[in-house]
Every structure is written in C-alpha cells, then in structure tokens.
Amino acid sequence: MRKIIAEPLTKDAFAPFGDVIEAEEGTSFPINNGKTQRFHDLAKVEVGGENARVMVSIARGQPYDLPLTLNMVERHPLGSQAFMPLTSSPFLVIVCPDESGRPGVPRAFITKPGQGVNYARNTWHGVLTPIGEEQDFLIVDRGGEGNNLEEFFFPEPYEIHLPER
C-alpha cells in the first residue's frame, strides 16, 4: 500500500484545489454597529447546469480510524462543495490533481480548529473524513438536475497517516 503523510492545511498548499475557509483578520470588517466582525467572501461557490441552485445542509460524520485506507475519490463536475466543521475537532482533507481526467497522486491535509474547505468544481477529493469524534459540518454545494458525481476507485489503495508528533 502506498503511504501518504497528511500535512497541515494552509491556503497556499490547498490553492490548486479550492479555498481554505477560516476567520482571519485581513478578510473582516465590522457590521451591526460594531458588535459583529464579518469575515467576508471566504470561498468561491460554483454552480452550473440545468436548474442549478446553492444548497445548505448539515452532515453528521462518524470518525474514521487511522491510518486511513483510501480506495476512492470523487469529484463534482457541476459545482463546488464546501465543508465547515461546527466543532473544533480536526478532520482530514484529501485531494488529487487531475491528470487527463483521472486523479493523480493524493495529497492529505489535517485541519486546525476553525478551518473548513471549499473544493473547487471538478476537484478530485476524498469523502468527508472526521477523526477523533463524531462531527457536524455545514455543507454548501450544488443542487439541481444533472449528474454531479463522478467516482474513481484506485487499482491500489493509499494509506493516509497523520504526521509524527
């Protein structure tokens, strides 16, 4: 089995795959008479296809055991897909570059508290992967007609590990 070590999630490292969603001072301004700080325009939501619309959902994910065996990735050709945790627990983010319509070698990231991700339209990615405990996530993605899911099963799985401490 091929081994992948998860790396810390950063905006620069994740940029080829989408957006890191997090509250940073450079992206905020006060609203509501100064009582609220708005962290603005943190991700590009993409929707395409017939009768496309933006959906907001909540998912409750069960934790995965580590190391994680990665057999499959998926992508959404008609829209982006964002996951924002509603807890402070970390989760794994797995993405692959596209290589002529197939996923390339995966990269794995581990989030820190307060980080979420927005997978850009057509980005190969792993499934929602909470670690440590059950977690709830706010999901922003595409609804509408048309097939918005493509799955790829690796002929040989990868094994995802957290970095050594």
UniProtKB/Swiss-Prot annotation:
Task: Please name the pathway.
Answer: Nitrogen metabolism; (S)-allantoin degradation
Does the record's keyword annotation contain Lyase? yes
Cofactor(s) annotated in UniProt: Ni(2+)
Q: Which GO terms describe its biological process?
A: allantoin catabolic process; purine nucleobase catabolic process
- What is the reaction catalyzed? (S)-ureidoglycolate = urea + glyoxylate
- An MF annotation (GO) of this entry: ureidoglycolate hydrolase activity
Keywords of this entry: Lyase, Purine metabolism
Keyword match Ligase: no
Recorded hits in Pfam families, A to Z, give: Ureidogly_lyase
Q: What is its EC number?
A: 4.3.2.3
- InterPro entries for this protein: RmlC_Cupin_sf, UAH_cupin, Ureidogly_lyase, Ureidogly_lyase_bac, Ureidoglycolate_lyase_dom_sf
Note the superkingdom of the native organism.
Bacteria
Report the family membership. Belongs to the ureidoglycolate lyase family.
General function of this protein: Catalyzes the catabolism of the allantoin degradation intermediate (S)-ureidoglycolate, generating urea and glyoxylate. Involved in the utilization of allantoin as nitrogen source.
Assembly and binders: Homodimer.
Q: What is the name listed in the Swiss-Prot or TrEMBL entry for this protein? A: Ureidoglycolate lyase
Q: Which organism is it from?
A: Chelativorans sp. (strain BNC1)
The major lineage groups are: Bacteria, Pseudomonadati, Pseudomonadota, Alphaproteobacteria, Hyphomicrobiales
